[in-house]
């Protein structure tokens, strides 16, 4: 089993959940603690053969080619996260990446600033893998990848999505996912329908 973790998704979840956690020296450590705690729980729960963690680039969203296609792409996130301490977030995220490296967990991210997101790498590796794949993310876009080999675990729902239950849970099948999102849009990414 290849377990692919949407590291950006997990990092934001950990940062928000443990935002006030600090080390004895006063430095914030909530993202680090939360990320490693959740990662450990997924490894214990799903017992993967291999773990891959992907991240969005730390660079500005303006360099993302998606902004050239749709000017308002993810615009509300910038407005909603004005109070977020990005310097602290990025510091902790760099620490998480170092820890993953020491644990021999493969980390993939756009270190060349090409505008690729974590999602791009998840899709690529899930589709290219020959064996079973479990994607860990709350991002509904991954439902389109679900088939006999690929499943998605949504941590917010604490539920594994597969071909049998996707339509009941999400309201659309994996084959209908792209059409559905094109029709209704995606508020989380500021994409109109």
Segment roles from a protein language model:
Residues 157-186:
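A short, charged helix-loop
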Residues 18, 126, 165-167, 193:
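Surface-exposed beta-strand edges and their flanking turn/coil or helix-capping segments
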Residues 1-134, 142-160:
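Noncatalytic, basic helical substrate-engagement surface that gates or grips nucleic-acid strands
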Residues 140, 183-193:
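Helix-hairpin-helix
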Residues 137:
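Short acidic/histidine-rich active-site segments
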């Amino acid at each position: 089993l290849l377990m692919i973790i949407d590291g950006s998704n997990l990092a934001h979840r950990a940062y928000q959940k443990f935002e006030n956690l600090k080390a004895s020296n006063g430095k914030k450590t909530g993202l680090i603690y939360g990320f490693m705690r959740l990662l450990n729980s997924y490894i214990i729960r799903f017992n993967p053969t291999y773990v891959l963690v992907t991240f969005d680039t730390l660079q500005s969203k303006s360099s993302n080619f998606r902004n050239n296609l749709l000017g308002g792409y993810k615009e509300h996130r910038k407005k909603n996260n004005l109070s977020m301490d990005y310097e602290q977030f990025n510091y902790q995220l760099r620490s998480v990446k170092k820890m993953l490296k020491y644990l021999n967990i493969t980390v993939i991210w756009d270190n060349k600033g090409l505008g690729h997101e974590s999602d791009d790498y998840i899709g690529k590796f899930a589709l290219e893998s020959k064996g079973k794949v479990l994607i860990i993310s709350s991002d509904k876009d991954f439902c389109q990848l679900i088939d006999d080999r690929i499943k998605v675990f949504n941590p917010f729902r604490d539920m594994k999505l597969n071909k049998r239950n996707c339509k009941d849970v999400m309201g659309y099948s994996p084959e209908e996912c792209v059409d559905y999102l094109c029709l209704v849009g995606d508020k989380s990414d500021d994409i109109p329908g």
